[in-house]
Amino acid sequence: MIGDDTLTADAAYRLACQGTAILWRGDYQNARNLLLALARRADRKPREGALKKPATQAEAFEQHRIAQGKRAAILAQLLVPLDANYKIPLRRGQDVRDACLAALGPETEASVISLRGLLALVSAWEWRKKGALVPALGARIHPHFGVFSPVRGEYVDLVAQAPLPAACRLAFDIGTGSGVLAAVLARRGIE
């Protein structure tokens, strides 16, 4: 469905909940505002009694994961167009070319992307350019899009502070994304 500045947040939310994608043709900043409004609606607590009270922690976790999946599916329904050069052909469209090139590679034809996904690309690009401060390293890491967050402190601090076996001289960081865990281990003298 085509959506523009006349589409209300309530109507957009109903459509998104039904699985209807909305291709935005209005003002880009209004699309961002609509995404925020959709998120607010998706984050509302269910009515009392609407969900079965979980009997175990595992059930509570499963309910949480299902709710997060539904939220993600709803927010992914708002789409924006990109031209062949990763330009957003909407009024007040943000410059996303460098972010898209870094994450997606060269584009040769027009395409469509979820606004939420596009904003994630832009956020990752800003991290790549400016870096993310990792206190355990006393330095910045410049991660690529789609890798382990270098600022997930609970993991980084654990690797930085946990006692290591005395004979440990070599470790493998399997699945290295940003390399932050390998850098923390290297700082501790591990090869």
Spans of features found by a protein language model:
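N-terminal auxiliary segments of SAM/dcSAM-dependent transferases
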Residues: 1-132
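A generic structural signal for short
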Residues: 7-8, 148, 169-170
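Generic structural signal for short, solvent-exposed loop/turn connectors between secondary structure elements
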Residues: 68, 104-110, 135-141, 164-177
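Class I SAM-dependent transferase core
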Residues: 116-165
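Conserved SAM/SAH cofactor-binding pocket of Class I
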Residues: 152-191
